[in-house]
């Protein structure tokens, strides 16, 4: 690529109609001349060849991705990760902002991903290390997406749960219970105060617990709990399956008693999520399998907040994500970035509920609340409710009691002195520390 060719892949924001472009933030490591590498990077993900032989034309004017800003962070002695490559020369770590014309792929998530994190992005000469850090959508692009059907306020209205977090619980044992056993445990947790009892992301439609039978048992238990507590409840059924079975699984689950649906968004694909969101009349909630496999490395892959943003765009009403606990191996800053992506302004797209989770209990609720900074989040313990020494009803009560302490401005330990379910969690924690 000669010097004039390179210039065709650079532009200023002021020279472009930015409503016609997505803005992409990348971290990358280039080998050799930086601007030549960046020009190749833009070319490979858009106009790899921009004219026909012997024809006076240039498709870059409309269709080329263009560098609108870049910063050289530092020169490196070697790449951050060993990647086989043919180029030689100095290695530079860079932050790069690219404007990519969305006319190249339209309002279609599979085509968008093919362009901005596909072959052209990760197989560019001179750019062996790449991480997509963020995507910014213009309102003209967002106008073609429906986004969440219910969102945060819709979920709150269904549950009549305002001014506090929404309390989920992952029914445990997560694998192995019969539908009847599963329903009894969920029922007890609803009596104790959970808003939502959910299937584990690994429990879907299996021979020993079909979605039809499980939804029927849970629907009956849910209605009984609602009658006894006077509170609306949700059974969140996992319908993750082959794409050609999703609509059938949706209908079976809802018809038999599920009033919200769980979907493992990346394993089934965001296009499938969008299809379900457009079809369903109940809340659709996503889980995070598969995402860490390409987001965890600091300088390669795709930042997890990009996937959260795309899940919201595809129509999820809530996004379950790795939370603050040490087991989740996610920096606090990254968790908060994902939480913010659920609720920040996004054109006409409604906010979705962030649900950061992992090894939570009544004893971590205050920490999560303080870190999130408001009540617009879901709190999703598993063993923190269903492994409670006094049983799942007491486990759910301990969550509600912890929230009461927070509302009253009283320490968990002090509030626990007059609330035995919460005290049991405090005592259990002390025993673990002694071990």
From Swiss-Prot:
Pfam families: RuBisCO_large, RuBisCO_large_N
Binding site for Mg(2+): 198, 200-201
An example Gene Ontology biological process: carbon fixation
Cofactor: Mg(2+)
Any one GO MF annotation of this record: magnesium ion binding
Entry note: cofactor: Binds 1 Mg(2+) ion per subunit.
InterPro entries: RuBisCO (IPR033966), RuBisCO_lsu_C (IPR000685), RuBisCO_lsu_C_sf (IPR036376), RuBisCO_lsu_fd_N (IPR017443), RuBisCO_lsu_N_sf (IPR036422)
Keywords: Magnesium, Metal-binding
Claim: DNA damage is one of the keywords in the record: no
Function: May be involved in sulfur metabolism and oxidative stress response. Does not show RuBisCO activity.
Subunit structure: Homodimer.
PANTHER family hit by this protein: RIBULOSE BISPHOSPHATE CARBOXYLASE (PTHR42704), RIBULOSE BISPHOSPHATE CARBOXYLASE LARGE CHAIN (PTHR42704:SF17)
Name of the protein described by the UniProt record: Ribulose bisphosphate carboxylase-like protein
Organism this protein belongs to: Chlorobaculum tepidum (strain ATCC 49652 / DSM 12025 / NBRC 103806 / TLS)
């Amino acid at each position: 690529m000669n010097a004039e060719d390179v210039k065709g892949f650079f532009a200023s924001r002021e020279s472009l109609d930015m409503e016609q472009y997505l803005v992409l933030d990348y971290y990358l490591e280039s080998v050799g001349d930086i601007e030549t590498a960046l020009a190749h990077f833009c070319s490979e993900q858009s106009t790899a060849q921009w004219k026909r032989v012997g024809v006076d034309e240039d498709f870059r004017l409309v269709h080329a991705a263009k560098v609108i800003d870049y910063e050289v962070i530092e020169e490196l002695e070697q790449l951050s990760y060993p990647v086989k490559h043919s180029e030689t020369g100095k290695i530079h770590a860079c932050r790069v902002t690219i404007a990519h014309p969305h006319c190249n792929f339209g309002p279609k998530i599979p085509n968008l991903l093919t362009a901005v994190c596909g072959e052209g992005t990760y197989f560019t000469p001179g750019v062996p290390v790449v991480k997509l850090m963020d995507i910014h959508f213009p309102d003209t692009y967002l106008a073609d997406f429906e986004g969440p059907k219910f969102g945060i306020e819709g979920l709150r209205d269904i549950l009549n749960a305002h001014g506090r977090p929404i309390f989920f619980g992952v029914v445990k044992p997560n694998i192995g219970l019969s539908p009847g056993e599963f329903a009894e445990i969920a029922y007890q947790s609803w009596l104790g105060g959970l808003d939502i009892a959910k299937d584990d992301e690994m429990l879907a439609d299996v021979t020993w617990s079909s979605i039809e039978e499980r939804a029927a048992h849970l629907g009956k238990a849910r209605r009984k709990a609602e009658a006894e507590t006077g509170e609306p409840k949700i059974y969140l059924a996992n319908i993750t399956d082959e794409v050609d079975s999703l609509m059938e699984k949706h209908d079976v689950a809802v018809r038999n008693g599920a009033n919200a649906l769980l979907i493992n968004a990346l394993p089934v694909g965001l296009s499938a999520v969008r299809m379900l969101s457009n079809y369903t009349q109940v809340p659709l909630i996503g889980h995070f399998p598969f995402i860490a496999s390409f987001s965890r490395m600091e300088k390669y892959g795709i930042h997890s907040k990009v996937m959260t943003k795309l899940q919201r765009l595809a129509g999820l009403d809530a996004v379950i994500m790795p939370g603050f606990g040490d087991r989740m191996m996610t920096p606090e800053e990254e968790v908060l970035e994902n939480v913010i992506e659920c609720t920040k302004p996004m054109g006409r797209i409604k906010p979705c509920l962030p649900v950061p989770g992992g090894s939570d209990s009544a004893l971590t609720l205050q920490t999560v609340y303080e870190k999130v900074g408001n009540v617009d989040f879901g709190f999703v313990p598993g063993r923190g409710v269903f492994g409670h020494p006094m049983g799942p009803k007491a486990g759910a009560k301990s969550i509600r009691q912890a929230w009461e302490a927070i509302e009253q401005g009283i320490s968990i330990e002090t509030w626990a002195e007059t609330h035995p379910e919460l005290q049991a969690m405090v005592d259990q924690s002390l025993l673990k520390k002694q071990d």
